[in-house]
């Protein structure tokens, strides 16, 4: 089994870990409900995408 020849220093570890980060999601405002949603997706609340209804909200009485 391979063993590292030298110990990895703190700076080398930290420089490598600077690329391990999350990016913030792009959010757009739904023109119908004014809620934030992901772009190019049907909104969960209204069911609209590009001014067309794709999901009908089912109400249980």
UniProtKB/Swiss-Prot annotation:
GO BP terms:
translation
Q: Which domain of life is it from?
A: Bacteria
Q: Which residues cross the membrane?
A: none
Keywords assigned: Ribonucleoprotein, Ribosomal protein
- Pfam families noted in UniProt: Ribosomal_L32p
Looking up InterPro entries in the UniProt record yields: Ribosomal_bL32, Ribosomal_bL32_bact, Ribosomal_zn-bd
Is the keyword Methyltransferase in the record? no
Q: Which GO terms describe its cellular component?
A: large ribosomal subunit
SUPFAM superfamilies with a match to the protein in the record: Zn-binding ribosomal proteins
| Disulfide bridges in this chain | none
A GO term for molecular function: structural constituent of ribosome
Similarity comment: family membership: Belongs to the bacterial ribosomal protein bL32 family.
Q: What NCBIfam families does its record include?
A: rpmF_bact
**Record-given protein name:** Large ribosomal subunit protein bL32
Give the originating organism: Phytoplasma mali (strain AT)
């Amino acid at each position: 089994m391979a063993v590292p020849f030298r110990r990895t220093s703190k700076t080398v570890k930290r420089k490598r870990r600077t690329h391990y980060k999350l990016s913030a999601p792009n959010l757009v405002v739904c023109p119908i409900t004014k809620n934030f949603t992901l772009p190019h997706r049907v909104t969960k609340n209204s069911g609209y995408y590009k001014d067309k209804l794709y999901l009908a909200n089912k109400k249980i009485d």
